[in-house]
Curated annotation (Swiss-Prot):
It is a multi-pass membrane protein. This is UPF0324 membrane protein BH02290. It is found in: Cell membrane. Its main location: membrane. Pfam families: Cons_hypoth698. It comes from the Bacteria. The lineage of its organism: Bacteria, Pseudomonadati, Pseudomonadota, Alphaproteobacteria, Hyphomicrobiales. Belongs to the UPF0324 family.
Length: 348
């Protein structure tokens, strides 16, 4: 009896702490779905998908209003946990054969683009007057996986807290801008759905954000972009190892590389293996995709709520210019590699 009471109290505490933020994200998500339906009725099609609308509505709300602190836990839960679950569920729609069919050509291209972006971004950062540590943080953030890479690299290169805060300040806003504008560029880039997936996987900051950048284009783009982005994230380990040697860090730092693989990547791979073993019935794939998309829309609302345009002041114009140039370099290099190597993988 006493154990049951403790469980009830724990659940009530969870609801009390998380429900305000979750409810805010749900309201924004419902509005986003409603606006998408309204678009279809007025124009015959949705020019802005619910994913994008959720980000926009969330960003407007987050920038115009300062939400009370008790909203934060629920918003963080939606932005992080729900989105990670969506990524895991997405693994059920991709088979191992599909990944292997991408070939070594794609893998080599990803590594090459990351390498070139790191060097050029670091150089440009230094030319803009950034410290070597800050320039490296900006370069790693854009080349690998945004804030996650910045946080992982910072202790290895002994970056100052101010440098970490400055490099992170503009990342959230720039990441949202990429998600919003990349789908609009697709018709003008003359890329197939597969090639657009490669481009998105190369330039979008985080694995979860890949869904928002590609869902409005095609599900093929979603699949390929996710795989490409996962490969980029997995490059964080070798990068940390190289930087630890370059900056003469101790062996203890290098031994922590196993912590650099997030649980949802392991979950994604696990689901992909289950799908490849034919253990997931085909009729369940549609509901799984629906749940993944629903969680993603809610998470995009939370992501938008975390964006504050006023953070531009914290970043400083040098960091803003360096980050913008870095992402442009990444995009141009990716497009060049797509065309030169005829990167057009097929997922099934």
């Amino acid at each position: 009896m006493g154990r049951n009471i403790k469980i009830i109290k724990k659940n009530l505490a969870f609801l009390n702490d998380f429900s305000p933020g979750i409810l805010a994200c749900l309201i924004i998500s419902v509005l986003a779905y409603g606006l998408e339906i309204l678009e279809k009725q007025l124009f015959g099609q949705a020019w802005l998908e619910s994913l994008v609308l959720a980000i926009l509505l969330g960003s407007i709300t987050g920038s115009c209003f300062t939400l009370p602190k008790y909203f934060q836990k629920g918003i963080t839960f939606c932005a992080k946990t729900l989105l990670e679950i969506a990524i895991v569920l997405l693994g059920a729609s991709i088979s191992v054969n599909a990944v292997l069919s991408a070939g070594w050509n794609l893998l080599a291209s990803i590594i090459f683009v990351i390498f070139v972006t790191l060097i050029l971004s670091f150089t440009i950062g230094r030319l803009f007057g950034l410290s070597s540590h800050l320039a490296m943080l900006v370069a790693c953030g854009n080349a690998i996986c945004g804030n996650s890479a910045i946080v992982a690299v910072a202790p290895v290169i002994k970056a100052k807290h101010e440098e970490v805060a400055s490099s992170i300040a503009f990342t959230a806003l720039l990441g949202v801008l990429i998600i919003l504008f990349l789908p609009f560029l697709h018709p003008f880039l003359n890329l197939s759905f597969s090639q657009y997936g490669v481009l998105s996987g190369m330039v979008v900051y985080a694995v979860p954000q890949v869904l928002a950048a590609t869902a409005s284009v095609s599900f093929v783009s979603v699949q390929i972009a996710t795989v490409v982005k996962l490969v980029r994230v997995l490059m964080l380990g070798p990068l940390i190892f190289a930087l630890s040697i370059l900056y003469h860090r101790s062996a203890q730092t290098r031994l922590r590389l196993h912590t650099l693989v997030p649980w949802f990547i392991i979950g994604f791979i696990f689901m992909m293996l289950i799908r490849s073993s034919n253990l997931i019935p085909e009729k369940t794939l549609i509901p799984i995709r629906f749940i993944a998309q629903l969680f993603t829309v809610i998470s995009m609302a939370a992501l938008g709520l975390g964006v504050d345009i006023r953070s531009l002041k914290k970043a400083g114009w040098r960091v803003i210019l360096a980050s913008t140039c870095s992402i442009l370099i990444l995009g141009v290099c990716s497009l060049i590699m797509i065309q030169l190597n005829d990167l057009n993988p097929i997922m099934f």
